[in-house]
Amino acid sequence: MWKDFKEFAMKGNIIDLAVAVVIGGAFGKIVTSLVENIIMPLVGVLTGGIDLTASFVYGSGDAQIKLGVFLQSIIDFLIIAFAIFMALRIMTKLTNKKEEAVVEEPTPELDAKEELLKEIRDLLKKEQA
């Protein structure tokens, strides 16, 4: 059983997934910091400093419905999703440019038969002209 588990855990795609989760977590922190410390203060300046987390609170005591916190979370999500979308779009464009630069079509080499056929074609064109 241990051998099977070790085999499963050491497969390439499992390791890739683990690395992706770690990098995704780190990238998530970067995007969250970008949103909280740069984008949201700018949005706050543009909207007159509106902070929805203290707004739209219904009820009292422990039984409170905090609609403002929910709306703020939706706005944060949309901004984070847009930032990730833009980052992925830029990375995709850069990757495509690198692939286009690397891919060069090799010139096809003609073998003896193709060369002979090409000469025959050229001779026929001369006779028709």
Curated annotation (Swiss-Prot):
It is found in: Cell membrane. It is a multi-pass membrane protein. Keywords: Cell membrane, Ion channel, Ion transport, Membrane, Transmembrane, Transmembrane helix, Transport. InterPro entries: Mechanosensitive_channel_CS (IPR019823), MS_channel (IPR001185), MSC/AndL (IPR037673), MscL_channel (IPR036019). Disulfide bonds: none annotated. GO terms for molecular function: mechanosensitive monoatomic ion channel activity. The chain crosses the membrane at residues 14-34, 38-58, 67-87. The keyword Heme does not apply. It comes from the Bacteria. GO terms for cellular component: plasma membrane. SUPFAM superfamilies: Gated mechanosensitive channel. NCBIfam families: mscL. Belongs to the MscL family. Homopentamer. This is Large-conductance mechanosensitive channel. It comes from Lysinibacillus sphaericus (strain C3-41).
